[in-house]
Amino acid sequence: MTANFSTHVFSPQHCGCDRLTSIDDVRQCLTEYIYWSSYAYRNRQCAGQLYDTLLSFKDDAESVFIDVRELVKNMPWDNVKDCTEIIRCYIPDEQKTIREISAIIGLCAYAATYWGGEDHPTSNSLNALFVMLEMLNYMDYTIIFWRMN
């Protein structure tokens, strides 16, 4: 019997970056980040300064959503619409604060990590990405750009 080891390390474009150069890169960077979060730690590239900043958004998720780990476990991640409605119970305004925006990103990153696969994302971890994309708009990307840099 032989052991089967994965040698693939997921390495998205912005993972090793220190900052973004354009607001237009924010959505792509966040998409890559949530996707990256779906991989097991040993199967993804080490985070650079930019991703370290994004990882800190989990702290905002804990302050906005309180018991974020329980929320991540109990939300119906197989249903994007229901998840967005649950988040809107915590963050009802269309005009979100910078802390609320980063909390949404942090919550979805928690979910992607919790529900992620060993060497590839799962349907639930991908739905965490879709929830984030559903919750954020261009104004949110513009606001969060300044915190990311």
Curated annotation (Swiss-Prot):
Biological function:
Contributes to virulence by binding to the host IKBKB subunit of the IKK complex and preventing host NF-kappa-B activation in response to pro-inflammatory stimuli such as TNF-alpha or IL1B. Mechanistically, sterically hinders the direct contact between the kinase domains of IKBKB in the IKK complex containing IKBKB, CHUK/IKKA and NEMO.
Record-linked Pfam families = Poxv_Bcl-2-like
Q: What is this protein called?
A: Protein OPG200
UniProt entry keywords in alphabetical sequence:
Early protein, Host-virus interaction, Inhibition of host NF-kappa-B by virus
Instruction: Kindly state the subunit structure of this protein.
Output: Homodimers. Interacts with host IKBKB; this interaction inhibits host NF-kappa-B activation.
Top-level taxon of the source organism: Viruses
Can you tell me which family this protein belongs to? Belongs to the orthopoxvirus OPG200 family.
**Biological process (GO) annotations?**
symbiont-mediated suppression of host NF-kappaB cascade
Q: Which InterPro entries match?
A: Poxvirus_B14/B22/C16, Poxvirus_Bcl-2-like, Poxvirus_sf
